[in-house]
């Protein structure tokens, strides 16, 4: 069992929910990322998604697109993200999920990525644009090296896709709260409740909801329905706005703590 599996087992026993934090690795520079992860963990983040910057990020909204551009400009590659993970592992046991697109993974090589990611301390991988209908070789390569494979289900997902997502996912299933790209929203889509129900019927895995979550109120609303809530653009925006500030890590920790309070006293 990976750190991801152990995390959710522990949280289930303690009747608590997970706050999953996304950040773009290498933004504003690769050297910044380990310290930013430490700040997120101090603030209460239970699992970290390390986003791999990519030149054609079709699922990303403008905030994360800009973060990817900054990270690429700073020389961040898939290989350097794995090096960042190694540095994080020197001081932390927080579960790490590699969040990337299919193209960089195919260029790197499936088996090579599985081996190198496992050696770097990565616990799982999520390919945002992977076709679950054609995922067998990818899943086999990741599982061969002990990595979880997390897949996305959206309000528009067919029953067949949900069935395959349930079959190939390990660790947890990532539910997209709405269609479209990532980004903060004032309100959450009403379509997420039927999606939760549909995926619950297909798997016993923990469910995490992401896309558009940026406030403690969002965390509170969804935390009563699923095992985990994912926050991404709100963290990335804070990093963007305070990249030159000596207090960036303190601000990130404080905001994480504020979001975590959305789960209530048992978070």
Curated annotation (Swiss-Prot):
- InterPro entries linked to this entry: Aldolase_TIM, RibuloseP-bd_barrel, Trp_synthase_alpha_AS, Trp_synthase_suA
Source organism, top-level taxon: Bacteria
Instruction: Check the record and name the SUPFAM superfamilies matching this protein.
Output: Ribulose-phoshate binding barrel
> What reactions does this protein catalyze?
(1S,2R)-1-C-(indol-3-yl)glycerol 3-phosphate + L-serine = D-glyceraldehyde 3-phosphate + L-tryptophan + H2O
NCBIfam families linked to this entry: trpA (TIGR00262)
Biological function: The alpha subunit is responsible for the aldol cleavage of indoleglycerol phosphate to indole and glyceraldehyde 3-phosphate.
Name of the protein in question:
Tryptophan synthase alpha chain
Coding gene? trpA
């Amino acid at each position: 069992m990976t750190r991801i599996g152990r995390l959710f087992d522990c949280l289930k026993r303690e009747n608590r929910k997970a706050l999953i934090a996304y950040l773009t690795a290498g933004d504003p520079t690769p050297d910044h990322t380990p310290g930013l992860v430490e700040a997120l963990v101090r603030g209460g983040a239970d699992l970290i998604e390390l986003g791999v910057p990519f030149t054609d990020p079709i699922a990303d909204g403008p905030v994360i697109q800009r973060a990817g551009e900054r990270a690429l400009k700073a020389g961040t590659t898939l290989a350097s993200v794995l090096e960042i993970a190694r540095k994080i592992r020197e001081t932390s046991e927080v579960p790490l999920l590699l969040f990337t697109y299919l193209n960089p993974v195919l260029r790197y090589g499936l088996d090579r990525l599985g081996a190198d990611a496992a050696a770097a301390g990565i616990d799982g991988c999520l390919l945002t644009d992977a076709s679950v209908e054609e995922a067998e070789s990818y899943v086999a390569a990741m599982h061969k090296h002990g990595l979880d494979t997390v897949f996305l289900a959206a309000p528009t997902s067919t029953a067949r896709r949900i069935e395959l997502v349930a079959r190939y996912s390990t660790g947890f299933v990532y539910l997209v709260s709405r269609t479209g790209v990532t980004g903060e929203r004032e309100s959450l889509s009403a379509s997420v409740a039927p999606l939760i129900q549909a995926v619950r019927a297909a798997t016993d895995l923990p469910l995490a909801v992401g896309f558009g979550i940026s406030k403690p109120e969002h965390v509170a609303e969804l935390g009563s329905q699923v095992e985990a809530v994912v926050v991404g653009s709100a963290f990335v925006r804070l990093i963007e706005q305070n990249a030159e500030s000596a207090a960036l890590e303190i601000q990130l920790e404080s905001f994480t703590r504020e979001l975590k309070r959305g789960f209530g006293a048992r978070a």
